[in-house]
UniProtKB/Swiss-Prot annotation, chain B:
Function, as annotated: Component of the cytochrome c oxidase, the last enzyme in the mitochondrial electron transport chain which drives oxidative phosphorylation. The respiratory chain contains 3 multisubunit complexes succinate dehydrogenase (complex II, CII), ubiquinol-cytochrome c oxidoreductase (cytochrome b-c1 complex, complex III, CIII) and cytochrome c oxidase (complex IV, CIV), that cooperate to transfer electrons derived from NADH and succinate to molecular oxygen, creating an electrochemical gradient over the inner membrane that drives transmembrane transport and the ATP synthase.
Subunit structure of this chain's protein: Component of the cytochrome c oxidase (complex IV, CIV), a multisubunit enzyme composed of a catalytic core of 3 subunits and several supernumerary subunits. The complex exists as a monomer or a dimer and forms supercomplexes (SCs) in the inner mitochondrial membrane with ubiquinol-cytochrome c oxidoreductase (cytochrome b-c1 complex, complex III, CIII).
Family per record: Belongs to the cytochrome c oxidase subunit 2 family.
Keywords: Copper, Electron transport, Magnesium, Membrane, Metal-binding, Mitochondrion, Mitochondrion inner membrane, Respiratory chain, Translocase, Transmembrane, Transmembrane helix, Transport
Binding site for Mg(2+): 224
Protein name, per record: Cytochrome c oxidase subunit 2
Residue numbers on the Mitochondrial intermembrane membrane side: 1-42, 105-255
Major subcellular site: mitochondrion
Designated gene of the protein: COX2
Transmembrane segments: 43-63, 84-104
Record-listed Cu cation A2 binding positions: 222, 224, 226, 230
Residues annotated for Cu cation A1 binding in this entry: 187, 222, 226, 233
Entry superkingdom: Eukaryota
Name of the top EC class for this enzyme: translocase
Length: 80, 255
């Protein structure tokens, strides 16, 4: 039961020390996407990066980017 | 229930919500708010001394050195010593204030590796919270909206315009990260007892962190004018013990 709730979240990122964390969210999301294209969806590393991306980004934002990835209108880099 | 004379001494009711005609602080629940209150009190102490000193000089000058008591005017216009004195003293006072003020400012910005991240999204006119560290069986995140309780639904003892239907539950003695953003216009997420106030700006994510030292219910309000219902989107934080928090999360992701 208690293994369902783990007290773990995205760590403090020394690259982004300020109050403005917009870039943390964006970079964490891209790191997750890069991992996905490299190691595949189900690797432990990618699952961790997915958690960290969702910890730093509003769910709406990630969902919008995922839609854009599908539609081919995503403004960020593409990892093949 | 037995009532002992003087037993009221044991009661200490802490003030975690605004009260009518309040001009002081609410009682602090985080080290940061304790720092803010202490800095304020320290500065006000010296401020009162300075006000008394300046008023005393001003009144002496006005009453003792007017045209009646001194019909012949002095003809000097400089005094190097006194000018040095009244330039250097205020600058030393300002430096004396700057040192603890900057120490506090930088300690507010300090981010310690948090255990929980909560996102607060300001909307017209309610707050949504996302606990995306936790998912249920269907891979859905723990997230909910937090609306004001209308006046007719209030129970005895609840606060008008401050109570919400879904409170944020947070464990005590844990480092918390809050990511604040807006979904439509600028709002501001503020809880006085925790010493936090952070603008919720669309397209930008702002991070604040705090460490609650005692269990309790903390009230705050949207603090950036955001439209007609700006005054009706309060914030309620319930700080509970760690075990209660885990239990709450489990119940929340099970249903
Ligand atoms: Cu607002």
């Amino acid at each position: 039961m208690s293994d369902v709730v783990k007290l773990e979240t995205a760590p403090r990122d020394p690259r982004f020390p300020s109050t403005n964390q917009t870039m943390t969210c964006w970079v964490r999301y891209l790191e997750w996407k890069r991992c996905q294209s490299k190691d595949g969806e189900d690797s432990d590393e990618c699952k961790k990066l997915r958690r960290w991306a969702y910890a730093m980004c509003p769910i709406d934002w990630v969902e919008r980017w995922e839609e854009q990835q599908q539609d081919g209108t995503f403004p960020g880099p593409k990892f093949e | 229930m037995k009532f002992f004379f003087f037993s009221f001494i044991n009661y200490k009711v802490l003030n975690d919500a605004a009260r009518p005609w309040q001009i002081g602080f609410q009682d602090p629940a985080t080290p940061i708010m304790e720092g803010i209150v202490n800095l304020h009190h320290d500065i006000i102490f010296f401020l009162i001394i300075i006000i008394i000193f300046v008023s005393w000089i001003l009144f002496r000058t006005l009453f003792l050195f007017n045209s009646k008591t001194n019909p012949v005017a002095y003809n000097f216009s400089h005094g190097t010593f006194i000018e040095l004195l009244w330039t250097l003293t205020p600058s030393l006072v300002l430096i004396g204030i700057a040192v603890p003020s900057f120490a506090l400012l930088y300690s507010i910005d300090e981010i310690i590796d948090p255990a929980i991240t909560i996102k607060a999204v300001g909307r017209q006119w309610y707050w949504s919270y996302e606990y995306s560290d936790y998912v249920n069986e269907e891979n859905e995140f723990l997230a909910f909206h937090s609306y004001i309780l209308p006046e007719e639904d209030l129970e005895l003892g609840q606060f008008r315009l401050l109570e919400v239907d879904n409170r944020i539950i947070i464990p005590v003695n844990t480092h918390i990260r809050i990511i604040v953003t807006g979904a439509d216009v600028i709002h501001s997420w503020a809880v006085p007892s925790l010493g936090v106030k952070c603008d919720a700006i669309p397209g930008r994510l702002n991070q604040i962190s705090f460490f609650i030292k005692r269990e309790g219910i903390y009230y705050g309000q949207c603090s950036e004018i955001c439209g007609v219902n700006h005054g009706f989107m309060p914030i309620v934080i319930e700080a509970v013990s760690f075990d209660d928090y885990i239990r709450w999360v489990q119940n929340k992701i099970l249903d």
